[in-house]
Amino acid sequence: MARLLTNSQAEELHKSIIAYLSANGLPETTAILRKELGVTEHDFNATAVKKYETLLEKNGPLLFAYRESRDSKAWLPQRPRYSLHSHRDTINCIAFHPKYSSIASGSDDCTIKIWDWELGELEVTLKGHTRAVRDLDYGSPPGAVGVLLASCSSDLTIKLWDPADGYKNIRTLQGHDHIVSAVRFIPNGSLLASASRDMDVRLWDVTNGYCVKTIQGHTGWVRDVCASLDGRFILSTGDDMTVRLWDISAKPENKLTMVGHENFNECCAIAPPTSYQYLAPLARLAKVSRAGSTAEFMATGSRDKTIKLWDARGTCLMTLTGHDNWVRAIVFHPGGRYLLSVSDDKTLRCWDLSQEGKCVKTIRDTHGGFITCLRWAPAILKDTPTDAARALVRQIPDVAEIMKNATFEESFSDVQIRCVVATGSVDKKLQIFAG
């Protein structure tokens, strides 16, 4: 069982079992287990017992169902485990901590709230922005002590928060001339990308707070931005109805401009390497070339109610239809086979890329209003150091080699993927879907 759980999950399970045994009148068994697991009386007082005594009964079926269904590559969200409510206005954005069971949500109420998604509890409320919080992202940039949380706002600023220091606001970045609509940490470096209604994409050095590059080309509000896994490329989209791929490895270069949507674009995503085996046939490729980039395939969502899949040549491979209103957010399943989307039609849809983008699941009635945001908990390693695994991935030049290596693929999916999805809405609720 330990192989399937993070340290945090294992600790919660141990405490839940101890509390359950204690509540059911088994003091000797409780004492033996507490000693075996190293849980002291100080660590597990009466308050802790009350907190955990019903947790096993609530989450036990989910835990064992997860053990029985170990193919995390095929997991899709079902009904929400928790519906969390504390914001006083629309939730615009969410972000998962890369290691722990924390999730951040940002709202029109100008606050950021940090929750424990395993327990369904609010941990802290962050105040600092003076207008709506538009986007959030966690990252671990070199030079920073641990993980940082970035937030951006309609107040024209970007703020950096330190989770290790009680989420202290350690830096405020200023430079955009209008609403800052999106932020994303760029992997393998100290850069943060931001998108704004001022039509610019900016790159910031989070170690000193300086804007190091301003990327121009869009002719309207830039709604969203994301980065490739190696940090070489960023993808941006917005109200000019274009999708732009930029090579930021040297002088910013508009490598590719894609046009096809018939209304403002709301969101974009770069496909992970695990998706290549499903997307390559759509591009009539036998496999991805060794000379290929880490931005071989992309997806965009629009107010025209569609999702489009693109390749690195700028070709629209497919248009996914089914939503009845604006597509607000999209995310690729870490296993690569599925693409998930949410919309103002109040649905979460799952599209199977192995079946030419067929919609195989529609989840309705979990929110009472437009669904504004969607995130999948980032993958983690439980048995292998994260840096070592990343180094291994970087040493394999062809994604096809990963797919051929069954042992690596199995460990990559079973050990890394966290089956947790979250959505936020104008109904002020944060929904947690967990397997």
Curated annotation (Swiss-Prot):
Key word Coiled coil present: yes
InterPro entries: Dynein_regulator_LIS1, G-protein_beta_WD-40_rep, LIS1_N, LisH, PAC1-like_LisH-like_dom, WD40/YVTN_repeat-like_dom_sf, WD40_repeat_CS, WD40_repeat_dom_sf
Keywords associated with the record: Cell cycle, Cell division, Coiled coil, Cytoplasm, Cytoskeleton, Microtubule, Mitosis, Repeat, Transport, WD repeat
Localization, UniProt: Cytoplasm, Cytoskeleton; Cytoplasm, Cytoskeleton, Spindle pole
Protein's UniProt keywords contain tRNA-binding: no
PROSITE patterns the UniProt entry points to: LISH, WD_REPEATS_1, WD_REPEATS_2, WD_REPEATS_REGION
Annotated LisH domain residues: 9-41
Alphabetized PANTHER family for the sequence: WD REPEAT DOMAIN 5B, WD40 REPEAT PROTEIN
Quaternary state and interactors: Self-associates. Interacts with nudE and dynein.
Name listed for the protein in its UniProt record: Nuclear distribution protein nudF 2
Protein encoded by which gene: nudF-2
